[in-house]
Curated annotation (Swiss-Prot):
The gene is fabZ. It comes from Synechococcus sp. (strain CC9605). The lineage of its organism: Bacteria, Bacillati, Cyanobacteriota, Cyanophyceae, Synechococcales. It is an enzyme of class 4 (lyase). One of its GO terms (molecular function) is (3R)-hydroxyacyl-[acyl-carrier-protein] dehydratase activity. This is 3-hydroxyacyl-[acyl-carrier-protein] dehydratase FabZ. Keywords: Cytoplasm, Lipid A biosynthesis, Lipid biosynthesis, Lipid metabolism, Lyase.
Length: 151
C-alpha cells in the first residue's frame, strides 16, 4: 500500500458519522487523512486511556484488544465499500477476515494509522479489502476483510 504524505483532514469525525452507523463507544475512526471513494482510505485512530476496554484489558498493562484493532480496520474498509458508485441501498456489514496477524502491541498514547484498499467487489454485494494498521511506521496488524450488503 502507498504511504500517505499528507496530514490534512479529509473527513472529520462528524463527516465519518454521516457515512458509518457506529457511535460511541464503538466509533473507532477519528479522522480520515486520505480517501479515494470506492478505492482506498487512510484513517487515524487515537488510542487513549479513557476508552472503556482499558478498565479490564488489562488494568496493570493496558493493551488495545486485537478484535478492536480489526474492527477499526473494518470501519475504514466500510468507508471504502459504502462509497462505491451505483450500489443498491443498504448496510454493509463486516462478514469475515482472512490472514489477520498482530505484529506489535497497541497501547494508550499510540496513534493507529489504518490503510485499506479495495481488492474486489462481487455482484455489488460482497466486498474485500486489504487492511493494515501501523504505529509510528511499525506494522501492528494486517489482513483481508470481507463485507456483505444487507438489505
Amino acid at each position: 500500500m502507498t504511504e500517505s504524505t499528507t496530514s490534512d483532514v479529509v473527513l472529520t469525525s462528524e463527516q465519518i458519522a454521516g457515512l458509518l452507523p457506529h457511535r460511541y463507544p464503538f466509533a473507532l475512526v477519528d479522522r480520515v487523512i486520505a480517501h479515494d471513494p470506492g478505492v482506498s482510505a487512510t484513517a487515524i485512530k487515537n488510542v487513549t486511556m479513557n476508552e472503556p476496554q482499558f478498565q479490564g484489558h488489562f488494568p496493570e498493562r493496558p493493551l488495545m484488544p486485537g478484535v478492536l484493532i480489526v474492527e477499526a480496520m473494518a470501519q475504514v474498509g466500510g468507508l471504502i465499500v459504502t462509497q462505491m458508485p451505483d450500489l443498491p441501498k443498504g448496510l454493509f456489514v463486516f462478514a469475515g477476515i482472512d490472514g489477520v496477524r498482530f505484529r506489535r502491541p497497541v497501547v494508550p498514547g499510540d496513534q493507529l494509522v489504518i490503510r485499506c484498499e479495495l481488492l474486489s467487489l462481487k455482484r455489488k454485494r460482497f466486498g474485500k479489502v486489504k487492511a493494515e494498521a501501523t504505529v509510528d511506521g511499525d506494522l501492528a496488524c494486517s489482513g483481508e476483510l470481507m463485507f456483505s450488503l444487507v438489505d
